[in-house]
A protein has these predicted regions:
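C-terminal capping region of solenoid repeat domains
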Residues: 13, 18-23, 35-75, 82, ...
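Short amphipathic N-terminal alpha-helix
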Residues: 4-11
């Protein structure tokens, strides 16, 4: 990751002139579109003929990932012309104001993509971090022009294309015969018709994400699962999906990641996953599915064996209580990451149950958890922090809690467990599930290294005294 904001504009090109021609992959955390365009634009020297143009900086780049202020036609065209070996292009912008036409992406810009025919992976995303904004100057025609040059594309991710309809998205599915990964975010005109004739295509999709696409219904999923080799299915914030969608998903034998956040599913609907799907799932998220109760735990796990599940997100479930977590602990699911933030009925009993849980007889209490997020759970008190000490949760590396409970206790816990990252300001722990599915940006859940093990073994026996003092001191004030 490279942060271009550390350099003045006139020094930026000088820095990259020193870069090795062998550099093949580059990720820049932030750069302005103007600086990038100037960097990659070929120039003609004072005594140089137009036929002898300076070769592009970074000629060997194959993978380019950029976060910019605005994705523009000029920038896209410059990248497409100048980087002749490019196979992966990932562009994300975060506008502060609504872009003018000269600082925006239009149909013309899409037409310039993949001029050298080597591009396999394309991602164009407009973030709404600062304001609600879209690629308003791109419509179905732009997608059609792009698809003509991208028939060999394997992965396409599009976010914020509010003028693109079913016609544009279907063009991608029918033109890109090698496509295996499709990601659409905030496709406000995307409907069930996009997937209506999936069985008529030659596609073998393995990764599909359609997030914030509120016109999709259960019928879309019934057609989508004709791709029986699906491994990742991200349906977050598609509010019209319900139990019938889960019933359709239940036929997928290779599904590894399923994200259903904010959907209209119920406890009984989750029971469709028991058997074929739950035994293959590695990651499951049902965050914000308001109809779910404690019964969803039994619907998923009771009577299930040899589970591969490592990551479970049951956050923001108003009807999930300690009883559900007690059942989860009883089922001995070998989870590595458990997120249950903002559950008002979750309290100290849940932490005690997880701390006491044994996945198998040869490992310690609560030994499988590397990440635990209990931020803003309504029933968490100082008592829970006693169960976050050693020897409980020996592998825990990430903990999310509410800092207002007792700052001194949190600070003492951080000092006594120096290899535990404690987040107390509502930070989301871990990474985006979509990226996790690709194993490109895996979070650091490593086992103890040799130095860490030596330090832990050498700790004195009274290491918890600070936490005891932190609990007593507030009572004496």
């Amino acid at each position: 990751m490279f942060d271009a904001s550390l350099f003045l504009r006139h020094n930026f090109a000088r820095v990259w002139a020193l870069a090795s021609e062998k550099l093949t992959s580059l990720e820049i955390g932030y750069v302005s579109s103007v600086m990038l365009t100037e960097l990659l634009s070929p120039s003609v020297g004072p005594h140089q003929s137009p036929t002898n143009i300076r070769p592009s900086i970074l000629p060997g780049i194959q993978k380019l990932s950029l976060s910019v202020d605005y994705i523009t036609d000029t920038m896209v065209g410059t990248i497409s012309r100048g980087l002749m070996s490019l196979t992966h292009l990932d562009l994300r912008d975060t506008p502060l104001i609504e872009p003018r036409v000269t600082f925006d992406l239009t149909n013309y810009g899409l037409q310039q993509i993949n001029q050298h025919g080597k591009l396999k992976h394309l991602s164009l995303f407009r973030s709404q971090e600062f304001m609600i904004t879209y690629f308003r100057r791109v419509n179905d025609l732009g997608i059609l022009l792009m698809a003509d040059k991208c028939t060999n594309m394997e992965s396409i991710s599009l976010g914020g294309f509010c003028q693109v309809t079913d016609t544009g998205f279907k063009t991608i599915l029918h033109s890109c015969s090698s496509l295996y990964k499709l990601r659409v975010s905030r496709g406000i005109h995307l409907t069930d018709l996009v997937f209506h004739d999936m069985s008529a295509t030659s596609l073998c999709l393995t990764h599909v994400s359609v997030r914030w696409c509120n016109l999709l219904t259960n019928h879309a999923i019934k057609n989508l699962v004709s791709n029986t080799h699906l491994k990742v299915l991200d349906l977050r914030d598609c509010k019209n999906l319900g139990d019938e969608a889960l019933k359709a998903i239940s036929i997928l034998p290779e599904l590894k990641n399923l994200l259903m956040d904010g959907s209209d599913i119920s406890d009984s609907g989750l029971s469709y996953l028991k058997g074929r799907v739950i035994s293959s799932l590695v990651s499951l998220s049902v965050r914000g599915c308001k109809r779910l109760t404690d019964k969803c735990i039994s619907a998923l796990f009771e009577g299930s064996y040899k589970l591969e599940l490592q990551d479970l997100d049951i956050s923001n479930l108003p009807h999930l209580s300690d009883n559900g977590v007690l059942l989860l602990a009883k089922c001995r699911v070998p989870i590595s990451a458990l997120r249950m933030r903002q559950c008002p009925l979750i309290g100290d009993t849940s932490v005690m149950a997880l701390a006491s849980m044994q996945v198998d007889e040869d490992r310690g209490h609560g030994s499988s958890l590397h990440l635990l997020d209990i931020y803003n759970c309504g029933g968490i008190t100082q008592l829970a922090f006693r169960w976050l000490r050693k020897p409980y949760f020996p592998k825990l590396r990430w903990l999310g809690v509410t800092g207002s409970i007792n700052r001194d206790i949190i600070d003492a816990l951080a000092r006594n467990r120096p290899f535990l990252r404690v987040a107390s300001h509502a930070e989301e722990l871990g990474i985006d599930q979509w990226d996790n599915s690709d194993s490109l940006y895996m979070h650091d859940y490593d086992e103890l290294d040799e130095l860490e093990q030596w330090l832990l073994e050498g700790e004195v026996e009274n290491e918890d005294e600070e936490m005891v003092d932190a609990e007593i001191n507030p009572l004496m004030l």
